[in-house]
């Protein structure tokens, strides 16, 4: 049976950035590295733009997974940061789950590396506990397309909604009249073609 449309609500959503670590990022091959980095930072920017509670977590930083990428540390200097000693599934870490539940939000926007493990495991666990889960596919990465689609199939069959960061931003925003300049600036910073669109729009507007 098809699940009813559950719309993202900026007043009931939190962002979970899972295991965007230097070592793990070297494994991402299903999307170009520069595009992937841009998408992750775009998700971070939209989380800040909409004032969404955001949680960072890493696993086994002292091992080959490596440290959290510095760009995310700089983007979120004061956000909860859970360095898991070894738990593969972030939901198995008590501090992480406490931080998630402390947000008071029921909609979880999740992205991470690698998709079929670091994203899928906590997403499936959260669904089991009654959360609505939205997986940001283009801010999550893995080894290859086969692995990616296997993860997406498992997640969607369990009830997760698969989205892109652009779709997340638009659904949270709801109405262009809320703040066209602010959201358009966010898009322009991460989508070159959108920057061209806004440049054209600004030029035409000034001519009127």
Swiss-Prot record:
It comes from the Bacteria. Keywords: Hydrolase, Lyase. Gene3D superfamilies: Isochorismatase-like (3.40.50.850). Its EC number is 4.-.-.-. Pfam families: Isochorismatase. GO terms for molecular function: hydrolase activity; identical protein binding; lyase activity. The keyword 4Fe-4S does not apply. It is an enzyme of class 4 (lyase). The keyword Membrane does not apply. One of its GO terms (cellular component) is cytosol. The active site is at residue 118. InterPro entries: Hydrolase_YcaC-like (IPR053152), Isochorismatase-like_dom (IPR000868), Isochorismatase-like_sf (IPR036380), YcaC (IPR048239). Homooctamer composed of two tetrameric rings. This is Probable hydrolase YcaC. It comes from Escherichia coli (strain K12). The lineage of its organism: Bacteria, Pseudomonadati, Pseudomonadota, Gammaproteobacteria, Enterobacterales.
């Amino acid at each position: 049976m098809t699940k009813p449309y559950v719309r993202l609500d900026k007043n009931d959503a939190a962002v979970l950035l899972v295991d965007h670590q230097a070592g793990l990022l070297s494994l991402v091959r299903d999307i170009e590295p520069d595009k992937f980095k841009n998408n992750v930072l775009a998700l971070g920017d939209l989380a800040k733009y909409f004032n969404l509670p955001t949680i960072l977590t890493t696993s086994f930083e002292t091992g080959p997974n490596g440290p959290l990428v510095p760009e995310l540390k700089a983007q979120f200097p004061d956000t909860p940061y859970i360095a898991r000693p070894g738990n593969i599934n972030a939901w198995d870490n008590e501090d992480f789950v406490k931080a998630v539940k402390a947000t008071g939000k029921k909609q979880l926007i999740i992205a991470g590396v690698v998709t079929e493990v670091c994203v899928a495991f906590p997403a499936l666990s959260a669904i089991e506990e009654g959360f609505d889960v939205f997986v940001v596919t283009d801010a999550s990465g893995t080894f290859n397309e086969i692995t990616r689609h296997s993860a997406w199939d498992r997640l969607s069959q369990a009830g997760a909604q698969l989205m892109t960061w652009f779709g997340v931003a638009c659904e949270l925003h709801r109405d262009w009249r809320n703040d066209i300049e602010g959201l358009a600036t966010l898009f322009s910073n991460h989508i070159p073609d959108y920057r061209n669109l806004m440049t054209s729009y600004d030029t035409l507007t000034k001519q009127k």
